């Protein structure tokens, strides 16, 4: 029984616990406690004579990314919607997005009454394929959103050139790529704007949260209006007890603000980010080599990537192996061997059960709009292949030791050797 699969009652490769995520920074508890007693828990709270935690984080994150402006927001989804609206995207416009991503890549476009146009991805990087984007541009296209997926950075040379050629804004969705860089420039700073998620699983997290970064002051001002009910931060210090937010009447918005608790936590977590990246990067490189020995194919990143980060470790099954059972069965077997979750890649958004515009009355904007937003009209063969063959592992596992990587490789090797025993 020692060599039989754990999912079938055999001994698991590993029974020791894995690193826990999130991992609070040294100053996190004190920072949150200071907010508790500060008398100001949100950006709309009364000014108390010192910069808000929201402003402190905004400055720190802008500096980290090498840009002039950062507008924190309530979530990654909110950040994407803010960026889209700040680009002028609205009713009936088309926005090109990758077909392989989290559902927010499509739902945020729907949320601004626009039409998501799903494009296929590069088979090596699993990021937006520039050739597919070129073929999808029409006179109705108003923006392109590129997602730096899993552990890869997209081909930004090709995508920025394409966007410039068609005079289209390019938004970088960096929810899975905090700190990555392309030709020496941080992701998010390469295009019109960059958006980030600070949700629980992310490499920089406050449980929930987000941010929009940009080099453009006018763009940042539009985002500020959109995320704070049409208000922006005052240009001068307010009096005690007054709000820092002022009403301008320039642009209507909604409340998508980050709380002071989240901002304080993010400022502290940011201090640990690069050190954690270094650990993940070293372990991912080791794991790449170990898994290649068994025929697995790790996800690649684009040639221009100068700093790689690893949100999700993604690896493709060896060619022609384990094809007799679904990927979910393989993932369950690996999870049983390791005592942590190994998951199949995202399904293409076009057939993700969580993405169903027809289930929401707010998107019933006429026969033509409903036809255009029907996800079944798109064919995404590369994304479909990834959903059949790519396995993923959360970055927390990469914060372990070298022996942990060897355990992962041993589990992948064991499941491959005993794959014939698996049944769907």
From Swiss-Prot:
Cofactor(s) the record lists: pyridoxal 5'-phosphate
InterPro entries assigned: DegT/StrS_aminotransferase, PyrdxlP-dep_Trfase, PyrdxlP-dep_Trfase_major, PyrdxlP-dep_Trfase_small
N6-(pyridoxal phosphate)lysine found at: 202
Biological process terms in GO annotation: antibiotic biosynthetic process; polysaccharide biosynthetic process
GO molecular function terms listed in the Swiss-Prot or TrEMBL record: pyridoxal phosphate binding; transaminase activity
Record CDD domains: AHBA_syn
Documented EC number(s): 2.6.1.100, 2.6.1.101
Pathway in which the depicted protein is active: Metabolic intermediate biosynthesis; 2-deoxystreptamine biosynthesis; 2-deoxystreptamine from D-glucose 6-phosphate: step 2/4; Antibiotic biosynthesis; lividomycin biosynthesis
Catalysed reactions, as listed in the record: 2-deoxy-L-scyllo-inosose + L-glutamine = 2-deoxy-scyllo-inosamine + 2-oxoglutaramate; 3-amino-2,3-dideoxy-scyllo-inosose + L-glutamine = 2-deoxystreptamine + 2-oxoglutaramate
Keywords recorded for this protein, A-Z: Aminotransferase, Antibiotic biosynthesis, Pyridoxal phosphate, Transferase
Pfam families from the UniProt entry: DegT_DnrJ_EryC1
Enzyme class: transferase
Database matches in PANTHER family: DTDP-4-AMINO-4,6-DIDEOXYGALACTOSE TRANSAMINASE, TRANSAMINASE
Family label: Belongs to the DegT/DnrJ/EryC1 family. L-glutamine:2-deoxy-scyllo-inosose/scyllo-inosose aminotransferase subfamily.
Job description of the protein: Catalyzes the PLP-dependent transamination of 2-deoxy-scyllo-inosose (2-DOI) to form 2-deoxy-scyllo-inosamine (2-DOIA) using L-glutamine as the amino donor. Also catalyzes the transamination of 3-amino-2,3-dideoxy-scyllo-inosose (keto-2-DOIA) into 2-deoxystreptamine (2-DOS).
Protein name, per record: L-glutamine:2-deoxy-scyllo-inosose aminotransferase
């Amino acid at each position: 029984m020692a060599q039989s699969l754990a999912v079938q009652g055999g001994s698991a490769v590993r029974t020791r616990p894995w690193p826990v995520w999130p991992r609070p920074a040294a100053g996190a508890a004190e920072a949150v406690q200071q907010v508790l007693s500060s008398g100001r828990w949100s950006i709309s709270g009364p000014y108390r004579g010192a910069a808000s935690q929201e402003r402190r984080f905004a400055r720190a994150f802008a500096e980290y990314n090498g840009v002039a402006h950062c507008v924190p927001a309530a979530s990654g989804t909110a950040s994407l919607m803010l960026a889209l609206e700040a680009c002028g995207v609205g009713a009936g416009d088309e926005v090109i997005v990758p077909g392989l991503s989290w559902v927010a890549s499509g739902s945020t476009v729907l949320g601004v009454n626009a039409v998501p146009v799903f494009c296929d991805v590069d088979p090596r990087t699993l990021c937006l394929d520039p050739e597919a984007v070129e073929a999808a541009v029409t006179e109705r296209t108003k923006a392109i959103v590129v997602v730096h997926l899993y552990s890869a950075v997209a081909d930004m040379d090709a995508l920025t050139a394409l966007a410039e050629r068609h005079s289209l804004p390019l938004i970088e969705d960096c929810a899975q790529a905090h700190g990555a860089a392309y030709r020496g420039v941080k992701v998010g700073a390469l295009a019109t704007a960059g958006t980030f998620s600070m949700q629980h699983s992310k490499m920089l997290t406050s449980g929930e949260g987000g941010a929009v970064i940009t080099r453009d002051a006018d763009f940042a001002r539009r985002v500020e209006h959109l995320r704070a009910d049409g208000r922006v931060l005052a240009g001068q210090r307010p009096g005690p007890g007054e709000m820092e937010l002022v009403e301008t009447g320039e642009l209507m918005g909604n409340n998508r603000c980050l709380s002071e608790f989240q901002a304080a936590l993010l400022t502290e977590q940011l201090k640990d980010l690069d050190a954690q990246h270094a650990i993940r990067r070293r372990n991912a490189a080791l794991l790449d080599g170990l898994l290649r020995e068994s025929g697995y194919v790790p996800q690649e990143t684009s040639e221009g990537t100068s700093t790689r980060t690893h949100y999700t470790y993604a690896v493709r099954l060896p060619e022609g192996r384990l094809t007799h059972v679904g990927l979910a069965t393989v993932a369950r077997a690996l999870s049983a061997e390791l005592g942590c979750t190994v998951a199949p890649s995202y399904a293409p958004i076009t057939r993700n059960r969580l993405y169903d515009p027809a289930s929401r009355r707010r998107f019933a904007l006429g026969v033509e709009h409903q036809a255009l937003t029907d996800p079944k009209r798109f064919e995404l063969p590369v994304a479909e292949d990834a959903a059949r063959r790519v396995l993923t592992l959360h970055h927390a596992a990469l914060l372990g030791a070298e022996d942990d990587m060897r355990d992962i490789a041993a589990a992948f090797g064991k499941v491959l050797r005993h794959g014939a025993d698996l049944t769907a």
